[in-house]
Amino acid sequence: MINIEKANTLIEALPYIEKHQGKTIVVKYGGSAMKKDGLKESVMEDLVLMSYVGINIVLVHGGGAEINKMLAKVDIESKFVNGLRYTDEETMEIVKMVLAGKVNKDLVNKIHTKGGKAVGLCGIDNNMILCDPYKNYELGFVGEIKKVNVELIESCLKSGYISVIATIGVGDDGETYNINGDTAASAIAKELNADKLILLTDVPGLLREPDEEKSLITEVILEDVDKLFEEGIITGGMIPKIEGCVDALNNGVNRVHILDGRVPHSIITELFTDSGIGTLIRKENE
């Protein structure tokens, strides 16, 4: 009976695998899925499986918990302004060391141990993420993206490698800047003309009632997003995520998925099964 169920699962996945073969998918990775070893393993397994079946994968990662841990070790306080990390010169050095060094290379190694091929990159490489200092309020070395150069990413994808990208940008003056991960993932997805953008979060998806997980909105049409803002359904940390989703959809990305990163194998459950999981945002009714 168990073997039949496994076979049925594989058969169910076949049309979805065929549909996604050769497509490019950008995954924003952060939150609990990065902190817990079991969840980290399941995400890496999902990415390697997707790569094996011919999907081009770009993994854009954060690392806030690791940055906080390192700052605490050197007695630097973690400060945030409107949800964005205040990044002075000393903090920026820690951010570079942790994101582009430890976290990025750990993820590349995890993918390798699962049998995949990966290359670790950051936004400084080949001037991949060009940015200006954030203008709205004083955040130190926090950048706003003005241009993304995906030549290096495309080269890695063509060679069959998963691109693992740390969200550090560079300015015209050569200064390095901390970049919001959701914003970076959206900008990279746009420039690659990706088929999908997937955001792993610490909630089931977009919720109608913030404290009620059963109020999950499973599907949103792009033209209805403004109404959700007006109704106060999109609030707090979900605001920059949804803004990034809208920007991606308006600039060539076909679909955006907001998934619960606390659920093991949430990515392949969403992409390769009939039931799916999380919130799908798309351009129009089908």
From Swiss-Prot:
Superkingdom field: Bacteria
Pathway it works in: Amino-acid biosynthesis; L-arginine biosynthesis; N(2)-acetyl-L-ornithine from L-glutamate: step 2/4
GO BP term (any one): arginine biosynthetic process via ornithine
Keywords recorded for this protein, A-Z: Amino-acid biosynthesis, Arginine biosynthesis, ATP-binding, Cytoplasm, Kinase, Nucleotide-binding, Transferase
Signal peptide from the UniProt entry: none
Name of the featured protein: Acetylglutamate kinase
Function field: Catalyzes the ATP-dependent phosphorylation of N-acetyl-L-glutamate.
Recorded name of the encoding gene: argB
Recorded GO MF terms: acetylglutamate kinase activity; ATP binding
Record's keyword annotation contains ATP-binding: yes
